[in-house]
Structure formats: structure tokens, C-alpha cells
């Protein structure tokens, strides 16, 4: 039974249904928790949906169960590189190369780790001040007379690392803050604003306050403080792919969702901190949108957004289902046509559909 589930998971992976693959591998692991290959394969599926931390955990478990499983080291190295943990990635890849010396991927990835590590070390080197030109009329100062030259400090790294991934209907932001009390975390949602403040005793408060790539529905957004992270789920106002978490000039901005005035009232939470003028922030966002001229993909995104906002329930269901199942290549408004069957991926004219290499 476990092998059958693993085969189905592999088929889902090849069909780019990575979330389904993770779920099926998890069920296979429940039935056979000592199979290293299941953990290594689930790690690969987790990498595809940007669950890099979970992928490292799976790879470590696979290595523990079967120390000679080369693909487990490859998965760990890949996930650690995505997390920018290049030294850890290199160590895993070197171990994998010793297990499978004929696998060229290890050498290529080790070389990339060396390059990244060298870049990090270069950033830490303090630049020397330029020498002053000599002058025949101005006497040179002695070492005792010369004022000390301040050495610029390396830029401080953020207190906590964060990452972002998305689904058609929501974007998920994960802040890797361990053992932070829930009462020390403040999260607020605006129409296109996210504000996160984490107070840590004895440290400067951590702030994450991006203007988001697209608009959200604040009433449907939520967050959870866990032992190892703060997970924030942003409900997208429209079914569309965000190019990044933060808005950038020239990127598409979605129109305000069509919700009732009752739902658009934002909840107010008691706080000792100064209140934020969300209306002012949103007015600035709207002014920037008004001044922008949309073209190309941005204009197309707005066109589809307008269709969605004015569509009836069946049309919206058809758009959501066709977009999600076709990996964004098909958008149908005919529920009778797509409601009873899976919508296959259809590449644009002149392009070829390719599967992820497993």
C-alpha cells in the first residue's frame, strides 16, 4: 500500500501537482516510516513549493535512515542553497559526492557554493581608505598627528529571516522567529499593506512593513505564532500570480475587491503603540496607481481582474478551477465545460510544455 501511494505521488509530481505529491508521500511515510526514499522524494516535492525548511528536515531523516542514499544529500544541498546556507549545503553535497562520485550535479553545485561563500567573505572585508596625494607645499602628517580613519561597519543582517510562497488564492509569509511569545507579535493588514512588529526583550524591535505586490482582503487574512516561526496568510483580492511579495514600480497592481461596506470595516485591536493612519497609506497607494500606465502583462492582468470582479458565482468557479489545474495556462469562464473534468495545461502557440525533471 505504501509503495502504491508513493507511485501515485510520483505521478502527481510529474504532473506538477506538488502539493498533492507532498500529501501522498506523507501518507506513504505514515505506513512505512523507515523508508528513506519516501523522505528524500517528499523533500524534492517540498522544494518545488518553496518549503525549504521542511525539505531539509526530510533530507536529514532520509540520510539518517540510509546514509548512502545520494539523492538525499542532493535534496539537502539544494534546500540549504535556497535558504542561503551555503556552508551547510556544501558539506552535504561533498558527502553526497563521496557516495556517488560519478554524479556531475554534485560538483556543479559545490562550485556554486564556493562562489557564494567567496562573495559573502568578500562583503565582510573592510575597505582601506584611499591614500592622499603628496604635495610639495603641504608637510605630511606623522602617524601620531593623523586622525583615526573610521572603518565602515558591515550592514547589519535582519534579526529574523523571512520567505514567501503563494497559491492561487493566497500568499503565505513565514518569519523564522523561534520561541517568541504571542503577545510580543503584532500583525496588521491593510488593503495593500502588511505590518509586522516583533518585540524581543533586550533587542531592537523587528519590523516588516512592505507594500504588497497585490491587494488583499484584510478580513480574511490571519496569522499564527508557532514555536519556530510566525506564519502569515494573506487572502488575495484576485486570483493572480504575484511576481514578488513587495510591490515594485512597473509591476501590476490589482483593483480593490468588490466587497460590501460592512466587510470592508477593519477590526481595531487594543494596542499601546501609536495608531497607524491606514487611510492615509491607502490614499498614497491609490494615487500611485492612478499615475501609472498599465501595458503588457499589467494591462492583461487588470483585464482579467475586471472580468472576475463582475462575474457570477459559476464564472468565478470556472476561472479558479481552470487557472489552478492548468498551472496558469488556461482561464475559462464556462463552468459547464470545466466543472466535470480536469483542465490540462495548454502552452501558448509556439511554445512547448515541459515537465519538471524528477
Curated annotation (Swiss-Prot):
Q: Which GO terms describe its biological process?
A: auxin-activated signaling pathway; defense response to fungus; embryo development ending in seed dormancy; innate immune response; jasmonic acid mediated signaling pathway; negative regulation of seed germination; protein catabolic process; regulation of defense response to fungus
Q: Where in the cell is it found?
A: Cytoplasm; Nucleus
Q: Which CDD domains match?
A: p23_CS_SGT1_like
A GO cellular component term found in this entry reads: nucleus
Q: Which domain of life is it from?
A: Eukaryota
Q: How is this protein organized at the quaternary level?
A: Interacts with RAR1 and HSP90-2. Interacts (via SGS domain) with HSC70-1 and HSC70-3.
Q: What is this protein called?
A: Protein SGT1 homolog B
Q: Which organism is it from?
A: Arabidopsis thaliana (Mouse-ear cress)
Gene giving rise to this polypeptide = SGT1B
